[in-house]
Amino acid sequence: DLAKVSIDAARNKLMDILSNYQGFIGCTLILVFDAYKVKGNQGEVQKYHNIYVVYTKEAETADQYIEKTTHEIGRKYKVTVATSDALEQVIVMGQGAYRISARDFYEEVERTEKQIREINERERGEQKNYLLNYAKEEDAKHMEAVRLGEITEK
């Protein structure tokens, strides 16, 4: 597990995965990291590529941040919260948000990554790069004639 080696590397990998997911799905995505035990932390919201990354402030848990944010925007926008915490699910649903379990969200992200790979492989197969595609027309005709044995180069 990457988290056992470096928590920062694990966070960055998660942010990259969710950034790809967001780009494919097209939703606004907010990733919340718990930083409530970090002394003097003022909290921070960063833009990482196409997602928002929140580090909670000292004495504020990720759950508290999610509850507050869901309360502010949950009735105006379609908000989905990924959590397996049963109490948190009840609270955010009471604020008008949808909920998805962490396991279900993980599986959705995995399916999305698979779709992205399949699309990339299909497009890569359709866009083969051949030298003749980039040659001038007269050079391409000459090389084709050589290939077919119509012209012998000495």
Give the residues covered by each predicted segment.
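Nuclease catalytic cores that cleave nucleic-acid phosphodiester bonds
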Residues: 1-154
